[in-house]
Amino acid sequence: VCSSDLLVRKGDEPIAFDHDCREGICGMCSLFIDGEAHGPGRGITTCQLHMRKFKDGDTIHVEPWRAQAFPVIKDLVVDRGSFDRIQAAGGFVSVNTSGNLVDGNALPISKPDSDTAFDAATCIGCGACVASCPNSSAMLFVSAKVSQLSLLPQGRPEAKMRALNMVEQMDKEGFGSCSAIGACEVEC
């Protein structure tokens, strides 16, 4: 923060970075810090990373996500619109518009299905899985979103097509293939 103030006073622009919630729930702050997605520590995002994780005098290397599908916009800001396009490719639910609608809240969902869908919905789309994968694969993100959308009764008729469309869009966006290394799961 002090460095940004000094740059502004000199008439220079501070380094651009993305942020939104500052609570670790939006994923906008995603950075590669000292060779790790979100920096040292597990289960946190960059905005939750405290300077006490580093020693006095440490040189800290901060980089944007490194993936073809996340082009750098400026400095540390990347375009993660590819995730939005993947979700849009499969994130739809057919609706009966004949007038004989069943209230969506009236459809019972079992507790195990609800819990599993909720677990899949915890993906905030930060991209740490892609950034940590040597192949820049988005398969963990896609599988989380496919699971989230397919476990609920709404949208079951198109579940298979949704999954195929999302994987196809992932390929179109330039993400790499999964080779089951598991780095994505470690960073998520």
Write out the residue ranges for each language-model feature.
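A generic, well-ordered mixed alpha/beta core segment in the N-terminal half of proteins
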Residues: 26-82
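A basic, amphipathic helix-loop patch mediating RNA/tRNA/ribosome contacts
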Residues: 4-34
